C-alpha cells in the first residue's frame, strides 16, 4: 500500500467544510467571499438579469410573437396511442377517458407515429394522410 493509493472507504461521506472557523480551516475570516462588496454581505446578491443599472438585455430587445389560444387546446395523437382506447370507436371523449388527451383538449389530430395493431374507427378527429393509410391497413376506417 502506498500513499497515492489511499482512498475513502466505499459508502463513506466526506464532512463538509465549515466556513468561517479560523485560519487553519482554509475558509476562515472572509469565508471564501473575498473582501467587501455586495456579494460578500449576508443577503447580498443581485437578481438574475440585473446589469448594474444598465438597461438589461431582456428589456433592450423588442417583444415579438404571441401564443395562439388554439394551441393550448390542441394536441397530437400518435397512432400507437389509439390502441389504448377500450372499444372499437376512437373519438375525443374516448381518448380523454383513456388518459391520452388532457381534459381541456378540444381539437386532436392523429399522426403517423408507431404501429397500430387493432382495427379502430376514428370519428370526429383530423387524420394525416399517412395515418389514414395505416388505419386502413390495420382494418380500420376514418369517419370525418
UniProtKB/Swiss-Prot annotation:
Physiological role: Binds to the 23S rRNA.
Protein name (Swiss-Prot/TrEMBL): Large ribosomal subunit protein uL15
A Pfam family matched in the record: Ribosomal_L27A
GO terms, biological process: translation
Keyword rRNA-binding belongs to the record: yes
Entry keywords, A to Z: Ribonucleoprotein, Ribosomal protein, RNA-binding, rRNA-binding
Protein family: Belongs to the universal ribosomal protein uL15 family.
Annotated Gly residues bias: 21-31
GO MF terms held by the record: rRNA binding; structural constituent of ribosome
PANTHER family, sorted: 50S RIBOSOMAL PROTEIN L15 (PTHR12934), LARGE RIBOSOMAL SUBUNIT PROTEIN UL15M (PTHR12934:SF11)
Superkingdom assignment: Bacteria
Disordered, as annotated region: 1-58
Phylogenetic placement of the source organism: Bacteria, Pseudomonadati, Pseudomonadota, Gammaproteobacteria, Oceanospirillales
One Gene Ontology cellular component annotation held by this UniProt entry: cytosolic large ribosomal subunit
Assembly and interaction partners: Part of the 50S ribosomal subunit.
Amino acid at each position: 500500500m502506498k500513499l497515492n493509493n489511499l482512498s475513502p472507504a466505499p459508502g463513506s461521506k466526506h464532512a463538509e467544510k465549515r466556513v468561517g472557523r479560523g485560519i487553519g480551516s482554509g475558509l476562515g475570516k472572509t469565508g471564501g467571499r473575498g473582501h467587501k462588496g455586495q456579494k460578500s454581505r449576508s443577503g447580498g446578491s443581485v437578481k438574475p438579469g440585473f446589469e448594474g443599472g444598465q438597461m438589461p438585455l431582456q428589456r433592450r430587445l423588442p417583444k415579438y410573437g404571441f401564443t395562439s389560444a388554439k394551441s393550448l387546446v390542441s394536441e397530437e395523437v400518435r397512432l400507437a396511442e389509439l390502441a389504448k382506447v377500450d372499444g372499437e370507436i376512437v373519438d375525443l371523449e374516448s381518448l380523454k377517458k383513456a388518459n391520452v388527451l388532457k381534459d381541456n383538449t378540444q381539437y386532436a389530430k392523429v399522426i403517423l407515429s408507431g404501429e397500430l395493431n387493432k382495427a379502430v374507427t376514428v370519428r370526429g378527429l383530423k387524420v394525416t394522410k399517412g395515418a389514414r393509410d395505416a388505419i386502413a391497413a390495420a382494418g380500420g376506417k376514418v369517419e370525418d
